[in-house]
Amino acid sequence: MKILIDGQTLLTAEITRGIGTYFRNCVEGILANDFSNDFYINSIPGAHLDRLSSWAREKLCLIDDPVYDIRAADRGKKYRSEQYSNSLNNDIEKRGIDLYWSPNALMDNVVLPTRQTSACQFAVTIFDLIILVMAKEYAKHWSSSALTSYEKKLELLKQDYDLFLHISRHTRSDFTRLLQIENKQHVVTPLAAGGSFRPYPFPKAPAINEYVVYTGGFDPRKNMDRALEAFAVLQKKYVADPRIQATELCLVCSLDKVAESRMLRRAERLGLSGKVRLTGFVSEAALLALYQKARCLFFPSLYEGFGLPVLEGLACGLPVASSNTSSLPEVGGDLAVYFDPYNIDEMADGLYQALQAPMDYQSRQRRYDYSRTFSWPETARATLRAFADCAGDMRPKRVA
């Protein structure tokens, strides 16, 4: 079987974010598990292919065409999309590709190609449908042209794509319910925490720093304002508890000077002066260190396609206080404390409960062991099985 992996993600900012984590781990897992199929990637030389391991790059055949440089500023979006689709379908025909896979289809900075051939199956990974689920909130933040483009992509998925890989059962449920796509293949291929995420590597835990770690941002679904309010309620409700009073809230997210100033002013108004720490963007190594020495993870997101920080926190042995929405209970299982992310008092109570959770070696190890029930190798194997099933539906049987 010949499989073509769409390489657009390599040319976008997403390569350093969650989508990029999925792309790298899934592609490398597929290549490590498969020795019978041929793999291609369409991109341009130097397109961050070095984000993949050298052995993985050696197993990929690069289909190089300037049209695949989606960053080109001299092309309008419609023209770029048409040219990309034409070149892709020509390469599919020319090389006899059996299955094309788009690992990142719905971001506004990538092209979702149309299908012009019946000789190849089209597969796509779906991370979430936030723009539909939280339409009112996102209508304020997206331009009308971006929303129109998103809607057109959804229609194209219904029309041209055969296999849908969903990163959670909840995402699959949202997708089939909202788009009413039942007569296609739907397979759940969950995410996983990276191998570096694990409890502090000594038999005895270090002295726990007095902070709660929050990973999120200024995206409306990340619920940062309510997170601050809930932390303020926690401080007021347990004013006689010296350990709670000594606990800070560590906000891990990218932010500019204006946003930083706004958050600090808001913290001051809530009586949290000196109790809120803003890290800005951090590397994976720095994030790991923050997780390992925190008292718990606070994840009050309104909606997630998966919720990787919950799994990363558990992998580091942390108690987790999480929203009870979307896919998050699916990810945290029985080991997280859940709350209604629209109810500030309930958020504060959930956070307090997580702060009381045991942090002995056995408890941390139990959280870590649970996190490892999600694994990139298994996700890669499930993806490969889905590819084989999908392509097997249309490939002619060989005559002995």
Each language-model region and where it sits:
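Carbohydrate transferase catalytic cores enriched for Leloir-type hexosyltransferases
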Residues: 1-400
